[in-house]
Amino acid sequence: MAKIVLCMVLLAFGRQVYGASLVPAPISEQDPELATCELQLSKYRRFILQAILSFEDVCDAYSSRPGGQDSDSEGWPFRHYAPPPTSQRGEIWAFFRLLMAQFGDKEFSPIIRDAVIERCRIKSQLQRDEKRNSVVLGKKQRFHSWGGKRSPEPPILPDY
């Protein structure tokens, strides 16, 4: 019985010493206004990221950066990109630049960069697969009897 009581005391003492006392609660749980701000920031980041990734030419925009792909210490990774003037993309890219500059979200820039790199990698892989599949299909059409160009078979002449 004494051992059980001793174990209970040690468990209670251990929980108090090693439990919540060493790991303080996150600030957002203590301050509801901060939790609201974190939620709004998360929504803003998701919106901007999805909007940027929805552009078909986002890979061109990222590739057009001067100084290589690793020089994004300035923050906005698409600073030097100018979309074609015939579309509304110029206005939208300007809007994104304005949002990024206003919020000064320095830690969000690497998130955008990594997402764009991943999207461009997937897009490149899909294009490579599509090209490979079209080449394979072309070979099948050429060399198989079910399609494509075939050389005409010589007529079979009867033996006399």
Swiss-Prot record:
Residue ranges of the propeptide: 20-130, 151-160
One Gene Ontology term from the biological process aspect of the record: negative regulation of feeding behavior
Organism: Drosophila melanogaster
Function of the protein: Acts through intracellular calcium in Malpighian tubule stellate cells to raise chloride conductance.
Name this protein carries in UniProt: Leucokinin
Location in or out of the cell: Secreted
Principal subcellular localisation of the protein: secreted
GO CC terms, sorted: extracellular space
Gene name tied to this protein: Lk
Signal peptide start and end residues: 1-19
GO MF, one example: diuretic hormone activity
Modified residues (Glycine amide): 147
Keywords, ordered alphabetically: Amidation, Cleavage on pair of basic residues, Neuropeptide, Secreted, Signal
